[in-house]
């Protein structure tokens, strides 16, 4: 049999694909909710890309108490780098939405476009990754972490001990993962 050619779909996954088979148990309401959630995730990705471009181009947005506007304008005002990967190993890295380190002050800002309440732990991990990658002692620098969500700004000045503990856990867990990989 000669199968139909669908090479244009290589690497893509359908919303109702076989590998995502859970949809066969959905009712109409669950399907609608799941679809809307997927669309919100895609919109969030597009908004992050838009924010990145605005920051790179230093294009401020109108001064309004809107999540995206506040995030972009603050990142530009603090001369931050958008979408910066913070790397410890292939087992542990992440992308900070906006970051800068100047005058011994680490700033990390995170844009949240969804409705699920964000948690500062993600930014604590970014701060730990920064300290590990750039060999900074958490107790020797100042840190301000911000989450922009729901037209609000949530600010945290983390305890350096917490950042150090997360960093130690990253190092320990990375060694454990590498040991398991070598045993395979």
Q: Can you name each region flagged by the protein language model?
A:
Residues 175-184:
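Accessory terminal regions of nucleic-acid processing enzymes
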Residues 1-95:
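Metal-dependent nuclease catalytic cores that hydrolyze phosphodiester bonds in DNA/RNA
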Residues 86-168:
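Nucleic-acid nuclease catalytic cores
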């Amino acid at each position: 049999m000669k199968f139909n050619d669908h090479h244009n779909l290589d690497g893509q996954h359908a919303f109702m694909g076989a590998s995502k088979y859970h949809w066969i148990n959905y009712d109409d309401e669950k399907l609608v909710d799941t679809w809307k959630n997927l669309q919100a995730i895609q919109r969030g990705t597009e908004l992050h890309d838009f924010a990145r471009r605005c920051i790179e181009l230093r294009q401020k947005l109108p001064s309004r108490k809107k999540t995206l506007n506040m995030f972009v304008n603050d990142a530009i005002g603090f001369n931050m780098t958008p979408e910066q990967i913070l790397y410890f190993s292939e087992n542990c890295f992440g992308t900070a939405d906006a970051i800068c380190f100047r005058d011994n002050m680490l700033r990390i800002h995170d844009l949240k476009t969804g409705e699920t309440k964000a948690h500062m732990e993600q930014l604590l991990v970014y701060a730990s990754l920064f300290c590990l990658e750039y060999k900074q002692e958490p107790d020797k620098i100042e840190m301000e972490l911000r989450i922009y969500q729901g037209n609000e700004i949530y600010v945290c000045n983390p305890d350096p001990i917490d950042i150090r503990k997360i960093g130690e856990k990253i190092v320990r867990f990375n060694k454990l993962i590498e040991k398991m990989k070598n045993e395979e």
